[in-house]
Regions:
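Conserved N-terminal beta-strand and adjoining loop/helix that marks the start
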Residues: 1-17, 37
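Beta-strand scaffold of nucleotide-dependent catalytic cores
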Residues: 19-21
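Nudix hydrolase/Nudix homology domain
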Residues: 26, 31, 93-147
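The catalytic Nudix box helix
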Residues: 33-65, 104
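Active-site-adjacent beta-strand/loop module that shapes the phosphate/pyrophosphate-binding cleft
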Residues: 59, 69-91, 99-101, 122-124
């Protein structure tokens, strides 16, 4: 079975989590934490910063590692490394995603997550990361712009 290694940014602002909705492929309309594949010679952190810049035109800071999720899909095995992050600069422009939402802890289960991301949500609820808050003096990431 094909193995894919990816990284995901759990971007938090004022106790809410940023989720994106896929606009393409077999899993179109499913929700996920933004991120992508780790390229050869790239660290996980470098990959995450690059992917968020490419997908959302935003620079993030990585606060801490959260978890690694292994998940079997019909055609591949996914290993996803997740990091708690914050916006450093940018306005979270949706360059690839169909939609995005800021979800507080009580609303994390209101969207149709991809299987691996669903495991991350469960992990967030059980580890106490739902209470994590960061007060930054950065441009307001509340506004999500569409390309």
């Amino acid at each position: 079975m094909k193995h894919i290694e990816v990284v995901a940014a759990v971007i938090v602002r004022d106790g809410r989590y940023f989720a994106t909705q896929r606009g393409y492929g077999e899993y179109k309309d499913k929700w996920e934490f933004p991120g992508g594949k780790v390229e050869p010679g790239e660290s996980r952190e470098e990959a995450l910063i690059r992917e968020i810049r490419e997908e959302l035109a935003t620079t993030i800071g990585i606060d801490r590692f959260i978890c690694t999720v292994d998940c079997d899909y019909p055609d591949f095995h996914l290993t996803m490394h997740c990091y708690l992050c914050h916006v450093v600069s940018g306005h979270l422009q949706l360059l690839e995603a169909e939609d995005a939402r800021w979800l507080d802890g009580s609303h994390l289960h209101t969207v149709d997550w991809l299987p691996a991301d669903k495991e991350v949500v469960t992990n967030l609820m059980h580890t106490g990361f739902l209470t994590f808050r960061r007060d930054d003096n950065v441009s307001d990431p509340e506004t999500v712009s569409r390309r």
